[in-house]
A protein has these predicted regions:
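Auxiliary Fe-S-binding modules of radical SAM enzymes
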Residues: 2-22, 30-33, 222, 230-312
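N-terminal [4Fe-4S]-dependent radical SAM core
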Residues: 2-74, 79-94
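Short amphipathic alpha-helices and their capping/turn segments at secondary-structure boundaries
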Residues: 81-84, 135-149, 179-180, 209-219, ...
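Short, electropositive alpha-helical surface patch
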Residues: 111-117, 144, 204-221, 277-299
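Conserved C-terminal portion of the radical SAM core fold
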Residues: 176-235, 251-274
Length: 312
């Protein structure tokens, strides 16, 4: 696989990267917490519209394992979510609609939910996770209206730029679909964060870095980099047990992250460098269950890269 030879970003020069927590703190003058909510949606590749079973890596909660229940009114969800972080001193929040596809459903119902969340003074912004094939003109117009009330970020799943991977994991969209929707959202001045997953067992390291290149070229404002978790109750988890798929070590993952950061423009916001699935459901890699140790190792590794390059 051939990559561009020029260095397209400042990360490659000194490995400084733009942490989203720092962006929010500078913007709002204090630490801002992201609280996970649900709009009570499903997905078109779960209900038969495009497919069944969902993406093979996705949990029964639609990758919203830490989100509040979608059966609760949004005000109640927010109050419950706030209690989880108020003990840390949290007073300002991003309302993150995380579970399933949060623009898939009746637009009037969704707009009512999002508007109610945006109307709360402690909610500074909305973050809405969705799929590129669930952003029709009516949804774009809704997001445009919401963006005039509070800043809106659309968190858009890419997962991989590899077409074979997208077929295997049952996403039911293409990388070009993703790129077209990023362009449309940016035309409406809506912030976009791309999600990619690293560690699919059939992908090479070059494939994974190419996904980061693809996001860099798509025009997205930010990125979430997520290591593949094999979870109980998912097709991916079943396949892991059946085929004994190899998993990355923490050391291997950290070096891969270094390569991915090197593929990104210096102004791109980094929203996540890894994730933590529900421990009770985690099959592998088990080291990801210790989030503090994982993040400390990754931070120290990236710092070592910065120190090494500064000494050259």
């Amino acid at each position: 696989m051939i990559f561009k030879t020029q260095n397209i970003n400042g990360y490659g020069e000194n490995m400084e990267y733009l942490k989203i927590g720092d962006v929010w703190k500078e913007k709002y003058g204090e630490k801002v917490y992201k609280i996970s909510l649900s709009a009570g949606c499903t997905c078109p590749n779960r209900d038969g519209t495009k497919g069944v079973g969902g993406c093979i890596f996705c949990s029964e909660k639609g990758s919203g394992d830490f989100a509040q229940s979608g059966f609760l009114p949004i005000a109640q969800q927010i109050e419950q979510a706030k209690k989880l972080v108020e003990k840390k001193g949290g007073k300002k929040f991003i309302a993150y609609f995380q579970s399933y596809t949060n623009t898939y459903g009746d637009v009037k119902r969704l707009e009512k939910i999002f508007t109610e969340a945006a109307s709360m003074p402690e909610i500074l912004e909305l973050a809405i996770a969705t799929r590129c094939d669930c952003l029709g003109e009516d949804v774009i117009q809704m997001l445009d209206r919401l963006n005039k009330i509070k800043p809106v970020t659309v968190e858009l799943g890419l997962q991989s730029s590899n077409p074979e991977t997208l077929k295997k994991i049952n996403c039911c969209y293409t990388a070009e679909d993703f790129k077209k929707r990023v362009k449309l959202l940016k035309e409406h001045n809506i912030h976009v964060v791309a999600h990619i997953i690293l560690g699919f067992p059939w992908e090479s390291r070059d494939d994974m870095v190419q996904s980061a290149h693809f996001v860099a070229e798509s025009g997205a404002d930010g990125i979430k980099l997520q290591l593949l978790h094999y979870l109980k109750g998912t097709k991916m988890g079943e396949d892991y047990l059946k085929y004994n798929y190899p998993t990355m070590t923490l050391e291997e993952y950290a070096t891969l992250l270094g390569d991915c950061l090197n593929a990104l423009p210096a102004g791109m916001e980094i929203h996540r460098l890894t994730g933590d699935g529900a421990k009770k459901d985690l099959l592998a890699p088990l080291w990801t269950g210790d989030k503090r140790k994982t993040m400390n190792y990754i931070s120290n590794y990236i710092k070592s890269l910065k120190d090494e390059r500064r000494s050259l």
